[in-house]
Amino acid sequence: MLASLSLFLYARDEQQVGADSIPVYQGLAVKLDLAKPIIEAARTAGKIQDYEIAINARLLNRFYPTLEFGYAMAECGADGGQHKGHGGFARLGVDLAVVKQGATENNFMVGIRFANALQNYDLTNVNQSVDYWPAQRLNFYDQFRYDCWGEIVAGCQVYLWKGLHMGWYGRIKLLMTRNAKIGQVMPYYVPGLGYRKDFNWGFNYYIGYRF
């Protein structure tokens, strides 16, 4: 019995030493999204252009605080009106490696993001009707808009060679800024979010390098 107790205490101490020996900070990665530029070029013939990069730190083999930022330009329409705008966006959040399996980069990831975007835009030929007045088409130039939303993300990353890795993310997006200010007309497109909807989705396929 004493031998069994000694063996248990030794194993526990060894496990504790192993856990304590994991460094907190384990490098920084930079990622470039390849999916959005290709998808939008094919889908909209270049009328929507969306570019983004991401930076994340690796902590304790499992946690990945992440900053994503980018720039988008869009020419699109709805109900006969036309939107032309450009602006930047940023997302801040953290990913968690689902499987705790040591120092490997290969893993499934889940995470959350808080995102915001600023843009300037023009809306032309917009259908407007007020009370009993007949509908008319109006133009709104030099509009400015701030939007924010939350995201739930899931995906995977795969180690390639000497710091190079690749992976993908699927995103579910929930728009928080749903109301317009007095005298403001909502944009049809939001950088980083996509077409303006209360719920939206997105996909990223990236290649990155960890330093």
Segments predicted by a language model, with ranges:
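Residues on the lipid-exposed face of transmembrane beta-strands in outer-membrane beta-barrel proteins
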Residues: 32, 53-57, 92-96, 112-116, ...
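Predominantly the C-terminal beta-signal and adjacent terminal strand-loop region
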Residues: 159-211
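Gram-negative (and chloroplast) outer-membrane scaffold detector with strong preference
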Residues: 63-133, 207-209
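Short glycine/proline- and aromatic-enriched beta-strand/turn motifs that initiate or cap beta-hairpins
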Residues: 10-58, 68, 208-211
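Flexible, solvent-exposed coil segments and beta strand-coil junctions
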Residues: 29-35, 68-77, 128-137, 183-188
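Residues that define the transmembrane beta-barrel architecture of outer-membrane proteins
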Residues: 26, 47-51, 86-90, 106, ...
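Extracellular loop and loop/strand-boundary signature of outer-membrane beta-barrel proteins
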Residues: 37-41, 76-82, 136-142, 190-195
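Short loop/turn motifs that connect adjacent beta-strands in outer-membrane beta-barrel proteins
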Residues: 13-26, 62, 99-107, 160-166
